[in-house]
Every structure is written in C-alpha cells, then in structure tokens.
Amino acid sequence: MRKSSSPSLSNCNSDLASKIFGIPLDELQQGGHPDNEVPFIVRHVVDYIEEHGGLEQQGLFQVNGNAETVEWLRQRYDSGEEVDLVKEADVPSAISLLRFFLQELPEPVIPGSLHIHLLQLSQDYNNEDEFGRKLRFLLQQLPPVNYSLLKFLCRFLANVASHHEEIWSANSLAAVFGPDVFHIYTDVEDMKEQEIVSRIMAGLLENYYEFFENEEEDFSSNDLSSITEQVNELSEEEEEDEKLEHIEELPEEGVEKSAGMPEVLQLRMTENLLDSDSVTASTRIDAAAATTTNASDGNIKCSKPVAGTTADNEVMQQDFVFEDQKNNESVGILLEPCSDHGDSEDGCPERKEYLLCDSDKLPHLILDSSSKIRDLNANTELEVTEGQSVGVQGEAACIQIAQLDLKNVSDGDKWEEPFPAFKSWQEDCESGEAQLSPQAARMTHHPLGEDCPPVLSHRSLDFGQSQRFLHDPEALDFSSKALSFTRIRRSSFSSKDEKREDRTPYQLVKKLQKKIRQFEEQFERERNSKPSYSDIAANPKVLKWMTELTKLRKQIKDAKHKNSDGEFAPQTRPRSNTLPKSFGSSLDHEDGESEGEPRVIQKEKTPSKEATLELITKRLKENRAERHLPEDIKKMTKDHLIEEKTSLQKSLLYYESQHGRPVTREERHIVKPLYDRYRLVKQMLTRASITPVLGSPSTKRRGQMLQPIIEGETAHFFEEIKEEEEDGVSLSSELGDILSTSVHTQSSLENLESDAEENQEKLARDLCLSSTRAASVPELLEQLWKARAEKKKLRKMLREFEEAFYQQNGRNAQKEDRVPVLEEYKEYKRIKAKLRLLEVLISKQDSSKSI
C-alpha cells in the first residue's frame, strides 16, 4: 500500500514560512512550492483521505474531527514539522483540518469580486448552456493559484461523488465544501446566498470535465497559467535568436529618410501557435485600411501579394519590444515569421518581411498587442479589397513610416509595457481580488465618418461567435451602433487611477463586518480576551467602522421598508468592479431600444391594504357559504371553529405576504377586524377543549380565556371578578342541588344489595360533601385547620423527596421521576382543592368573619 505523504515535505520545510494557516495562497506558493500551485498541505490531506478515507461511510464529511487533534495538527504544520497522518490523525480530523485551512484563508478561493458576479449570474440565467459558458469564462478570471486549488478540490470531490454516488451526491458535497470555498457561513440573512453557492458548487462537481478539463474551448480565456507556460516555451525556443532587442536599418528605394526619424517598433510573428495551449498575443492589421493607403499614396511596395492566411497562420503570435535608438532616426516594423522548429534568421533569410507604413495612416492600423488574446473561432484572415495592386520588389516587402506618433495609440503616459512582462501588473494588485487580462481595458471611441472604411470590431466579451467586422454603420446592431472602439492597454482593472464604481450597501456591510472580525481576532490573539465596547471606542478606526456599519444597516432597513410600500422601484444590482462595461451586453433586451432611451421597469402594481382586506373578507364569506357555516361565531360548533380558524390563518398569511406584518397604528387599525375575529375563534376553541376543575373559583383565570388587551381601550377586570363571584354563588347552589339529589339516590340505592359495593365510595364522597355543605361555620373552620395541617405535612414530605432527588442526580425531579410518590402528589392536589372549597363556603356563609 502506498504511504500517504506530502510531496517532498522535508525539502520544502526549510523554504516554507513559519505559518501555513491564515497565509494568502500566493505567499504559500512563493515560500513553499513555486512550481506547484496547489498548497502541499491540501495535497497531503487529500492523498491521505483517498488512501485511508473509507469514503463509503455515511456522513463522513459532515462529522467534525476531534478539536484537540485538529489544533495539534495545525500547530505541527505551522511549525514546519513533518506530519504522518496515517499514525497521528484520523480521517474526520484530516477532513476538518482541510476545511479549517480553507476557512482561514484571508481571501477565499473564489475572491469577493468574482463571487458577487457568480451570484448575479446564477440569478440572471435559466439556460444551462449559456450559464455554463459564462461560468467557464468567470472561472478563468481567477488568479492561477486560486484556479489550481479550486480545480484540485473539484477533481477530488467529483471523484468521490462519482464512485460513491449513493452515499455522497454532488449536492451534499457542495453543501459541505461550498461555504468553505466561498466563505459563506450559516447566517439568517445569508441563507439564500448559501443556497446559490451550493448550487454553483454542485454544478462544478457534476460538470467537472466540462469546466476544467475541456481545454479546446479555452483559447479565448484569460488563464494566466497557460500564458505563463506559453511565454516559457517561447523563451526556450528563442534562446539562440537575437531576442528581438536590436534595431535593424531597413534599406528602401525611392523613399527619402527625414532627419528626425522616430523609434523602431519590432514585431516578431510566430506561426507555431496552434500547437500551444493558449495565445499570449496577437496582431491584428486592418488590411483594407492599409491597402487604401497604398492606393492613395503609392508608397507601399511588397515583394509578394498579401492574401488570406492559411489555417496554420490564422492566429499570429508576437513579442515586441520598444527601444530608443541613440540617434532616433528610423522607425521599422519587423514582421518575421518563424518556423515551428525555431529556425534562426540565418537559416531562413527569405522568410523575412519588413513592413513600414506612414504614421498619419496609423489610426487605420490597429495593433492589439500581446495583451490581446484571440479566439480561434474568429475570422482572423486579412481582408484585402479588390482592385488594389501590390508591387513586388526583391525578397523583402517594406512599407515606409515617416513618423510614429504613439499618442494616437494610447493615452500618453498610460502606455504600459508589452504583455510578456505581465508580472508587473500581477504584483500591483494587493487586494487579493481576481484580476482580468490586460486585454479587457477601457475603450476609447472614435466617431465613424460616412466614408470611413470598415474596421475590426472591438472585442466585446460576449460568448459564442460574434461579428468581427463593422460594416455599414446604419446596419449595425444595438451593441455596436455608431461607435468604433479601440482598446487602451492597461495593467489591470484594479489600477489606482481607475475610478471604481460605488459599492452597494450590502457589499459595504460585508466588508466592514470582515474588518471588524479581523480586529476582534487580532485583539483576542494579543490579549486572550474579546474586545469590550471600551476597547472598540478606544480605537478611532474601529469606532468609525462600527458607526458606518450602523448607518448602513439603518439605510438597508429603510430601503426595505420603502420598497415594501412601493415608493421606489427595486434597484438593479451593479456590475462587478473588475469586469468591463461590455460584459453581459448580450443580456440586454435589444429589440426596440436604443442607448438614449431609458429603460422602463415594469412592476406589477400591488393592491392597497384596504383592497386586500376587502378581498379577504369576501373570500371568507364565500367559503362559509359553501361549507354552510354560520356567520356568528357563537353559533359554531367545535368543528366549525376549527375550519374557521384555518381559513382565517391562511387569509392573514396571505395579507402579510402582500403587505408585511402591520407595524404602525394605522396598519393595525386597517386589519384589526380580521385579527380580532382570529383571536376570538382561538379563545373559543381553547374554551371548548378545557374541562374546568369543580369548585375552583379561579377556573376562569386559569383556563386561558383572557380577553385580548386592545390598544387604546381600558380593560375592565372588576367585571370579570364579579362574574366569578356570581359563578361561585351559582356553583354553590348547583352543588347543593347535587348533594340533595345524591341523598335521595343514596336512600334508593341502600335497598339494592347488588350495587352496594360499587356505590360505597360514591356514597362516602356524597356524604362528605353533604356534611360539609350543611356544616356550620365552626365545623367548617375545624375542617379547614385539619386540611391545612395535612397539606403542610404532605408538602414537607414531598419537598424532602425533591431535595434528596436533586442531591442524588444533580437535577430537578421530572414527572416520570415522581412515580414512587405519585399517590402523595395526588393526595396533595385533592387537599388543595378541598381547602379552596372550604374557603368558598366560609366566605359565603359569613362574610363578616375573617379566617
């Protein structure tokens, strides 16, 4: 059996920083495994789980490991020691350690910016194919380390789901690991968001090979890992070449060189792109515009006609370097196709082509530098207009450029380095958010003239095949009407000079909560106690966060209240801060709309509260008529009351779903009749199900039949007391009738010998009641004193039993624990009832005497 161990743990311990948990992924990669983008602790734990997991066990991933073992393993890993999980841990502890590592990451595996857009994408799309394409694109915006870790985890979980589908489905695994990947935890306000996250995670596991292993559709992606591999391959192939850092003087006949010639722009175009995984750079040349320049000026001479490229040359790759010539004389664009085997320039001199063009025609020459990644599905052939001839001159074709004005290509000082040096813009981002490729920068629009030739369309980030050329401006669709765009290369969307969009209150609340939580964790680590309010108030920054958080929560609450009243239309969720404006443009409804026309939000009109109440009342009356129920509640039977209660309950739930629970006095006044009827029905049902204790004067108060306290009205409790007294008088009269009847029954039953034994106990009770009813006040007082003494004795005995039980078991005695003294409890209750009866009789016979 293969022993589960981390890859070269002993070697990486020396290079690894002192901590692993709570460290960003990029720092872990730089400190531990520069060539391996998955943290070694993740590989170590996953290998152990696959070897010794016993994944067929039910609930394995849902059982938490031993907390002490997990903490001990964490300390071992943080100290750089070599850990043998086979001997020192168990599977639940290893799984808990893996989840703890994901939870402790400062930035989740799915960064916050992409997380927000993923949630919006899952809500906007019902089409699975379209959702899959959009999701695949967003996943490839992840940083390389995050993408590799997510791919590794999804591969592991997908294997578990495929081999143990009956025990572990993709949905159950997504529910366990989804919150750890997205940093979404079980909070009341995040339950809906957690469901969306689990659904996205389940989709990644169910379609793992489509999202991660299918590389054929990823040529248009921004996967920086594939870009890195491509740059490394090109650097190895061109080690023997000139590195494209020299400047070559290009002789040309019939063209005069001016005294002040600008810099040299050298472009090296390779043909071996189709063998690689991705495209790092490409050059787009508007051949139509170039040949128009040929026809007008006649300064362009080519050695061979420019035709549509073959399939191998449809996508061209280049590295270009800008250098300052000491004499600042000439400008040249070196186009040198290289063979698949990386032949040197001496080996194939006939394959060199030199292209020089005038600087005043430069706006018609669109150069998408190495930051522009081309799609293989796009039409990349160079279109040449008919009727334009190309002259042949020797072996090299040259187009002379009199002056190169780089200001026409970029915004002056915003011109950046070519894309192969992409580490600079990768290091600029310190926030940990997902970065897009530099190809998706802002677009500068230039108005199209009437006689302007068609140019290449800007690369909108829509999915599927799109029109690559803009033809007649009048026939353009809504997405590209009346404007042509030129991409300005930027280092990233997180540039300091790029103005960010305003965040929503929900995003700001989450950000502030995260900052406050980090402060509390740091405070607890330093002082081993949670910060008090005085500690928070002592820190001005944290106090400011708390104040802003309170304001934002109040703002969200007010917005919800206003939206519920229909005062404002719901605001659309803003786009992600890192995605270009053109993203999702295909989602807009294009029919019958233009950019200048405001969109009309069609919202169903919510009926007023009065109209809803009238509708509910009408439905209740119809329902009672169908079931033949009386309108008066007092005439209803118990079954009728149950049906009426159910109908009222459903009606109130419908009202609250439309208008919310009534809060203000006006809202409660509108729906008051409905709530009052519901309360009255509940009270009558309770009253019908309760059997009152005979002879108790407080039956009414103990029977849960209290009337509701209505706001603004005085409650009359004395009337209820009078009613109880009247009920007591009627009770005593009824009791006398019962006693007299029982005496006559006794005289008749004495003659029946067959029923004598059965009726002895009843006769004894009746005689006792009769004697009690006919006794004088002194006799009643004597019985009262005896009953009190007996009650005191029983109470003392029961209290001793309960105290002994508490000392023995450490808890109070429950109902099932009182079985040994059950008879004593019953006797105690009987004596209490007798005492109440005696008190009533004494108070009725002689109200002037006090006990």
Swiss-Prot record:
<comment type="similarity">
    <text>Belongs to the FAM13 family.</text>
</comment>
<dbReference type="GO" id="GO:0005096">
    <property type="term" value="F:GTPase activator activity"/>
</dbReference>
<dbReference type="InterPro" id="IPR000198">
    <property type="entry name" value="RhoGAP_dom"/>
</dbReference>
<feature type="domain" description="Rho-GAP">
    <location>
        <begin position="23"/>
        <end position="212"/>
    </location>
</feature>
<feature type="compositionally biased region" description="Polar residues">
    <location>
        <begin position="573"/>
        <end position="585"/>
    </location>
</feature>
<feature type="site" description="Arginine finger; crucial for GTP hydrolysis by stabilizing the transition state">
    <location>
        <position position="62"/>
    </location>
</feature>
<feature type="compositionally biased region" description="Basic and acidic residues">
    <location>
        <begin position="596"/>
        <end position="611"/>
    </location>
</feature>
<feature type="compositionally biased region" description="Basic and acidic residues">
    <location>
        <begin position="556"/>
        <end position="565"/>
    </location>
</feature>
<keyword id="KW-0343">GTPase activation</keyword>
<protein>
    <recommendedName>
        <fullName>Protein FAM13B</fullName>
    </recommendedName>
</protein>
<feature type="region of interest" description="Disordered">
    <location>
        <begin position="556"/>
        <end position="611"/>
    </location>
</feature>
<dbReference type="Pfam" id="PF00620">
    <property type="entry name" value="RhoGAP"/>
</dbReference>
<dbReference type="InterPro" id="IPR008936">
    <property type="entry name" value="Rho_GTPase_activation_prot"/>
</dbReference>
<dbReference type="InterPro" id="IPR039102">
    <property type="entry name" value="FAM13"/>
</dbReference>
<dbReference type="GO" id="GO:0007165">
    <property type="term" value="P:signal transduction"/>
</dbReference>
